[in-house]
């Protein structure tokens, strides 16, 4: 008898709509591959009952908090249900941009200079030291919530007087916010599937940066796979991504986002342990370049579940 698979989709995070689309695509791909799969939305269904509902494995197609942050992974482990993607610790670290950066920096990997602020510090008023640290980053900067995905709450700041509004927006989404030196790009993303590093993708948004609209709504964002890098650059990028991935303890499948700055140096942006799987998504694009159909991709991700 084949395993009965729960595809978790939707959920309650800011990325619910994206997750519903990802989950629907994953479900169709698994079924096409002969897998006995069913959609389960944690917003509608008590996921603590998955085992009693007869499920033997879980494909996590949730994005953001409550699905990608280690909490769900811990629950599934306590229930003894194998699931796709990274474990508890790696999921929690990867969704947290600040702690990812601290670990990468500690491992000697390149990250953009940044200043981290808490909501309490912001509400109290920034100290002269903090203001000096922010000023030292120069302009423009990018302001982002530490634990939000899909560029939610993120904004580019080109003038000093716009910083407060950008921080206010970011603090609507998290208790910790990063102010990062702006990197000129281009942006690349590299997908990982088991032990395999898939071909890199170069991203060219039509707007200021690769924001929510560029990721999920715009048809003007351009993607290049292969990315057009020289063989030595591609090898360097893949080696960097593998180090970043293993430093966080990630496994299964996912994506690392990287920026190439004007100095010719790659800088790590963030890790995604449950990336989008929509029509605009990048892991399926990289898999296609590697000769893998969408159905083959999702079946392979499921095979890696433990």
From Swiss-Prot:
Residues at which Mg(2+) 1 binds: 257, 270
One Pfam family here: Dala_Dala_lig_N
Pathways per UniProt: Cell wall biogenesis; peptidoglycan biosynthesis
Keyword Signal: no
Residues binding Mg(2+) 2: 270, 272
List of residues binding ATP: 134-189
Cofactor(s) of this protein: Mg(2+); Mn(2+)
Residues annotated as domain ATP-grasp: 101-303
Stated family: Belongs to the D-alanine--D-alanine ligase family.
Protein name: D-alanine--D-alanine ligase B
Organism this protein belongs to: Shigella flexneri
Name of the gene: ddlB
